A protein has these predicted regions:
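N-terminal/edge-of-domain interface segments
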Residues: 1-196
Length: 196
């Protein structure tokens, strides 16, 4: 008898930001997609089987696993908030490709010329790493890996991480600017409102 799945470590009280307009990479496959770029440009990707709970929590598109983009390869995209949030922490679900990688997220408020900016450095471990980077925990784990050329690697278990960075002081935020580093793949972003 299989053990029940481990609950996802979703950020308590976190407000999820909408990534849908910015998704530009398919990092989860439900079958071999030889022509796919995957997470590293060579086709390596999560096997979608076993990630259904994560897909639902992260709001993946209906056709995820079939080549539909499910994450954002960071190229400086701007995530607009529906309403301003006074944030006390930033949460990022994602992975790095090519080793542990850090990027600077910019929490902005105001117009482009007069905006107040709070920079938040987030480090994510590689999707094939066994251990998380600092300030991170395991978010989800696939049953196996689709390797270069669409080959199935059942001995490899790619992992998705959840990084949490508390701000030194609460910051008013109306938009979040992602880093410029396509080796960082973001599957989910949350802001935790300040409750003081």
């Amino acid at each position: 008898m299989n053990a029940p799945p481990t609950p996802l470590p979703l950020p308590a009280g976190g407000v999820a930001l909408d990534l849908a307009p910015h998704r530009n990479n398919a990092g989860c496959h439900s079958r071999s997609l030889i022509a796919a770029e995957g997470l590293d440009g060579f086709g390596r990707a999560f096997a979608a089987h076993g990630l259904q709970a994560a897909a639902a929590a992260l709001g993946f598109p209906e056709q995820w696993g079939e080549g539909e983009p499910d994450n954002v390869a960071c190229e400086g995209q701007t995530l607009e908030l529906a309403a301003p949030i006074k944030a006390s922490a930033l949460h990022v679900a994602g992975v790095a490709a090519g080793g542990s990688t850090a990027g600077v997220f910019r929490l902005c408020h105001g117009d482009a010329g007069t905006s107040a900016v709070t920079t938040v450095r987030v480090r994510l471990a590689d999707f094939l790493a066994r251990l998380p980077a600092e300030d991170s925990v395991l978010f989800a784990e696939a049953d196996f890996l689709y390797d270069i050329g669409g080959r199935t690697q059942r001995r490899a278990q790619p992992r998705m991480w959840l990084a949490t960075v508390s701000l030194p002081r609460p910051a008013l935020c109306t938009r979040v600017e992602l880093p410029v580093n396509p080796d960082l793949h973001v599957f989910g972003v949350w802001l935790r409102p300040d409750d003081t």
